[in-house]
Amino acid sequence: GLGDVYKRQHMYNCLYDCSYCFLQGMYNSANYLVFVNFHDYQNEIEKIIKKHKEKKMTFFTGYDCDSLAMEPITNFINDFVPFFSRYKKALFEIRTKSINNTVFRKHDPLANCIVAYSLMPEALAQILDKKAPSVSARIKNMKYLANKGWRIGLRFDPLILSLIHI
């Protein structure tokens, strides 16, 4: 398993505005809020890792935002990939729908980093994920990253049972 799981929250709201997403009213404002104190977050993560040296643990991002989509503005992933390269037992998972792969070309692949893509049937995505890259574009990007040595994860999100007739 993934061991203890920690959500890393560096930003609120998402540019993709997917119609089913809980972020559609989660916060008082639809404005983006970016926390820029990455060093403080890294210090806290480091404390957790050192305190629980023998435990498996996963730190993920992409719950309250799409970290990869906003990377050109936040520089978050560029900052955290080198950080996690020092902690091989800690898994860093980046949850995304973005096809922005620029940051991954700047770094060597990490065995403890997973780029996890949310997927659903293309026809459903055209209805629900109108502002997000197409599923086929995401799959193409996953292949590109996998060929470069990055680990890929799949997240089937949302799981909807016949709520929409396609």
Short names for language-model regions:
Residues 144:
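Hydrophobic/aromatic ligand-binding patch that stacks against planar heteroaromatic rings
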Residues 25-141, 151-155:
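Core AdoMet radical
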Residues 7-36:
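Canonical Radical SAM [4Fe-4S] cluster-binding loop centered on the CxxxCxxC motif
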Residues 159:
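Catalytic metal-binding/acid-base residues of hydrolase active sites
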Residues 163:
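Catalytic cores of alpha/beta
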Residues 2-6:
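Short, small-residue-biased leader/transition segments that mark boundaries at the very start
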